[in-house]
Amino acid sequence: MSSRRKPSEKRRGRRPQRFERPRGLVVTEGTVTEVQYLQMLQQELPRDAASLKLIGEGADPLRVVKRALRERKDGDYSWTVCLVDCDNHETLQDALRLATKENIRVLVSNPCFELWLLWHLEDWRRHSSSRDIQARLAKLKVLQDKSLTSSFPIGRYADTRARSGKA
């Protein structure tokens, strides 16, 4: 007579299969605001969204792309993105060429990343300096120095995408 297990006993000891989230590498020109924003966004997104490694390089665009290349060699990433500001960087074109050659996406904020933050709050379409945008964010009490405040409306990222498409 064979020993038969109950269906519930058969399942015991089996581990459910783990879903592997895609891993992304994001290297930013900024060391505070961009990294903080992406951390907040990652918490807002569904748990099965990508797992991000965030690095604030704090350098010109070419150094940001080169850092992404170094980091990418050490990890198994599904994709790599660099965030840089347009500013007046002499290295921007070289960074874009290298990134294209190495299959790295570069998102260039014009004039600065803080414009993306402002779009969480209002439809801002006029040409402005980085200083003007940062001053507006401070007046709205969502940016203090370079740090986002707890009142920053991270949940409005869908509105932000729509506003950026109109600008």
Where are these regions (language model features)?
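Short hydrophobic beta-strand that contains or immediately precedes a catalytic carboxylate
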Residues: 26-29
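Acidic, metal-coordinating helix/loop segments flanking the phosphotransfer/catalytic sites
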Residues: 66-74
